[in-house]
Amino acid sequence: MKLKFEKNLDHQSKAVKNTVSVFDELHVQSPKKQGAECINPKVDKNSYAYERNIRELQKAQEIDTRYCDARSNIIDVMMETGTGKTYTYTKTIFELNKALGIFKFVIVVPTLSIKAGTLSFLKSESARSHFMDDYSKTIEVHIVESQKSSKGNKSGFPPAVRSFVEATATQNKIQVLLINAGMLNSDTMQKTFDQTLFDRY
């Protein structure tokens, strides 16, 4: 069964617009070093515009402007349950790609069940065709799973992490690494590997 998403719901559109507006007038620099085709552009958040944009949003939403740390990389977007958070942050991904050229994103979810639901949404034909109509792009999902160690074999990076890191910018793909929070401190992500991400032989 193919679902049809209702476009431009006001509360979702505002969340997307406000998030993207944090980066208004910030300098975006394309990477020039080796492997540049695999690297997101660099957004200069050290400019005055970054803090100004956040403070203007806080004032518009009647949020205490004391809660603004211009040195932080964290932007806290709060939405109530049942308001379409997964759809909203997915649309935000497409809009950030459109505005800034960012093509790699990491989605960290709290539980395995939410991870499964997120994966189901991102890979559904309904979502793919919906966003394809608006942006002429699709999302390629790299799913980080726990790895069982095998004695005697070389230990390599999780395949999803490697494929995500090595993915290059293309006209019609956005790369997303999907991981649950528990995996961040798991053996899979903490151990030392016998190979680096860019080892070929």
Mark where each language-model region is.
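RecA-like P-loop NTPase motor core of helicase/translocase proteins
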Residues: 1-201
